[in-house]
Amino acid sequence: MPRKGHTQKRDVLADPIYNNKVVTKLINNIMLDGKRGVAQKIVYGAFDRVAAKTERPAIEVFEEAMNNIMPVLEVKARRIGGATYQVPIEVKPDRRQALALRWMTTFSRARGEKTMEERLANEILDAANNTGASVKRKEDMHKMAEANKAFAHYRF
């Protein structure tokens, strides 16, 4: 417990093109070494590719992909009487979004396409179609929670 109280959550500004805070968070996640311009070019380029491939608004496809990636349950280690149990807990909405964005960027970087723009676009498309590494990660997390359902009564 901090003595001075909790810090306030800073709100991000909505991005100028899509007027969406989640897109800004994606840009911040993609950004390396403070190069926001490069990150914006990657994200907006990827969104253009997504719109061209699906013939739907890119933001719509992105939101669908985010919904498919966001985890509902996760496991947290809890030590009780010398044994460590993996206790399933519900994921808070802010953390859900943060995890989904983190997985999307991590697995985009790990892909084999030539440019980051292509990688991100294809990861978004895969996630929207319920395939891809980030969706698999969410499903693995849910399987872990399901397997450890017996320890749910040790909740925090």
Curated annotation (Swiss-Prot):
Alphabetic keyword roster: Ribonucleoprotein, Ribosomal protein, RNA-binding, rRNA-binding, tRNA-binding
Pfam families: Ribosomal_S7
One CC-aspect GO term: small ribosomal subunit
Gene3D superfamilies on file: Ribosomal protein S7 domain
The keyword Calcium is assigned to this record: no
GO molecular function: rRNA binding; structural constituent of ribosome; tRNA binding
SUPFAM superfamilies: Ribosomal protein S7 (SSF47973)
GO biological process, one term: translation
Transmembrane segments: none
Domain of life: Bacteria
Oligomer and partners: Part of the 30S ribosomal subunit. Contacts proteins S9 and S11.
Family: Belongs to the universal ribosomal protein uS7 family.
Biological function: One of the primary rRNA binding proteins, it binds directly to 16S rRNA where it nucleates assembly of the head domain of the 30S subunit. Is located at the subunit interface close to the decoding center, probably blocks exit of the E-site tRNA.
Name this polypeptide is given: Small ribosomal subunit protein uS7
Organism: Lachnospira eligens (strain ATCC 27750 / DSM 3376 / VPI C15-48 / C15-B4) (Eubacterium eligens)
Gene: rpsG
